[in-house]
Amino acid sequence: MENCLSTLVFLLSIALVLFPKTGVSFLAAEGASDSDSKVYIVYLGEREHDDPELFTASHHQMLESLLQSKDDAHNSLIYSYQYGFSGFAALLTSSQAKKISEHPEVIHVIPNRILKLKTTRTWDHLGLSPNPTSFSSSSSAKGLLHETNMGSEAIIGVVDTGIWPESKVFNDHGLGPIPQRWRGKCESGEQFNAKIHCNNKLIGAKYYLSGLLAETGGKFNRTIIQDFKSNRDAIGHGTHTATIAGGSFVPNVSFYGLARGTVRGGAPRARIASYKVCWNVVGYDGICTVADMWKAFDDAIHDQVDVLSVSIGAGIPENSEVDSVDFIAAFHAVAKGITVVAAGGNDGPGAQNITNAAPWLLTVAATTLDRSFPTKITLGNNQTLFAESLFTGPEISTSLAFLDSDHNVDVKGKTILEFDSTHPSSIAGRGVVAVILAKKPDDLLARYNSIPYIFTDYEIGTHILQYIRTTRSPTVRISAATTLNGQPAMTKVAEFSSRGPNSVSPAILKPDIAAPGVSILAAVSPLDPDAFNGFGLYSGTSMSTPVVSGIIALLKSLHPNWSPAAMRSALVTTAWRTSPSGEPIFAQGSNKKLADPFDYGGGLVNPDKAAQPGLVYDMGIKDYINYMCSAGYIDSSISRVLGKKTKCTIPKPSILDINLPSITIPNLEKEVTLTRTVTNVGPIKSVYKAVIESPLGITLTVNPTTLVFNSAAKRVLTFSVKAKTSHKVNSGYFFGSLTWTDGVHDVIIPVSVKTTISM
């Protein structure tokens, strides 16, 4: 770690957490000359007062002092951050940026860089249903949904690509007045009329474009930005994520007949505020800038949202102190009681690629659902095999051919077999009727134009290839896919889901939690060519993130005084370590294995259990100060971030003592002792006993082994954990757990330990 705040807030660009494409060539070149102005974010820390006009005036004055001209200062200023924190975005040359960074009130100057780009059954699967399910007896009229009136008083802020407001998922039927605390607004714009398109469901709609335009010549060039100059969603991503988090009930929805059911969000009566920061740039899934993101966070803090759902992130961590969706802006939101839920990224299954790793973010991994779309393949010898697809018929009956890497095969009118193709467009226009694609298992299904793609694994693919090579005139029949819910489909951590350990702060476990994020059905923009009646199946941690955001909205309704850290603790300590049906959860990858904390954090989110966790590992500003101090940040910088004088203790606090609902020891030499503090949020008189599952070769001891809560005044207790290794050589990570149980509540935290032997 670097011992300076500048590295702490090193924020690169922001990209939708979907799938990667190429770089952004139309933006200002990295090697621009000093005379070229670019966007820089000048961060000044916590606000010193509550008058936003005074902040804007002071930002103008600082720029005027730098540029020696009122007009130049006015023209330079892009955004003034004035609600959640103090700072501004401005067009500056590199020398001007360097000069202003030396101002005594400036904490850091951050370049507004942009990089390349890298959701129906979900709620039944998680036991969060209006009707009881086989997995959760508590999902009834007394369940979390009903206890919170489905989140009717919660406000979910969605920072994304905007909203398609006409979608039925944003109807406000049966909703009461907008919560009185709401201070936001709807902004009209291109094909978006605030008076028509906003209602008691969609209560906020804003868009942020200045940061992007400043990087692209200052004009809204429609040959580059093919989007609406408003909150209207041209991509569909924001509409999809908003649906998952808080969409209203829409019955009898399907994707070409598949996955039929009722679409709704996790908090179906919650209010939605949409903050559009990502734009449809030609050749990309969506482009967003840090400057626009900061302003959206700033406004959301002012608007008083309860949770921010952010399916956005930077790339794989490199050398930055924090590779985060927005480290500083998110910190200020959390400090003001807003839970920020962020996508962990889609760079799995390799290790150490988790993004959005700040300790105050709730970082989400993605799992599959217990749902599949089996597709019957019948070979000409009457052998029947099963694959998966989104093919909905009618039945295909053709000759069958193998397409090798040279593609030197007559494929017209045939079904072809391919292995590991990543270029489906390569067979377009060649008259192919269907494609059977053999690949490693990842549960990712797709439709490619009008050609049906049938997905299978290598074993079945090899079986089909053997049939082709031993048959004079091979043929195949492909039946329409069907929808299968429940067993035998297993819950798995998705292959694409980014994994820990946390390469930025190894002692901070990331991801925190996992949720369904594969083939999630939700509303999209009808402009999406793959949409069916305004709905689509998307995959990514972009989809698992709003699942958790919707659950947080319900928890906030039930426990309005809980902090964001308490919310996270409730999710982590009550999560499923097996699937809801009791089967093991595996992690997809080159070698399928049982999932561990680096795959899914605490486990698969369990909404009803999280409502009554018993104990929580709470955190506040003091814990975040300890985090910064333990990483070596100087007192003056921390003081400016917090807006009050702060002094780190001597010796500096241990990062192992940060009160997380997890224990991660990345370099255990012999033994170490750490502390945790729990807050009783259950019955006043409770007794909890420790149950330890030590990692292999590690001895864990807890002191005390019993926690006795006997009064309202005694709700907070601290305990210590000693970890001692018996390994004689450097080891990889081994995993265990620590559970506090009172016979009703099992409060479980994951333990991850790696032994490091000094040379």
From Swiss-Prot:
Lineage top rank: taxon: Eukaryota
SUPFAM superfamilies in the record: Subtilisin-like
UniProtKB keywords: Autocatalytic cleavage, Glycoprotein, Hydrolase, Protease, Secreted, Serine protease, Signal, Zymogen
E.C. number(s) listed in UniProt: 3.4.21.-
Main localisation: secreted
Signal peptide positions (record): 1-25
Molecular function GO labels: serine-type endopeptidase activity
Active site: 160, 237, 542
PROSITE patterns: SUBTILASE (PS51892), SUBTILASE_SER (PS00138)
Entry GO CC: cytosol; extracellular region
UniProt cross-references to InterPro entries, sorted A to Z: Peptidase_S8/S53_dom, Peptidase_S8/S53_dom_sf, Peptidase_S8_Ser-AS, Peptidase_S8_subtilisin-rel, Peptidases_S8_3, S8pro/Inhibitor_I9, S8pro/Inhibitor_I9_sf, SBT
Subcellular localization: Secreted
Domain Peptidase S8: 122-611
UniProt-annotated glycosylation sites, renumbered to this chain: 221, 252, 353, 382
Pro-peptide region(s): 26-118
Pfam families from the UniProt entry: fn3_6, Inhibitor_I9, Peptidase_S8
All copies of domain Inhibitor I9, residue ranges: 39-117
Family of the protein in this entry: Belongs to the peptidase S8 family.
Protein name: Subtilisin-like protease SBT3.14
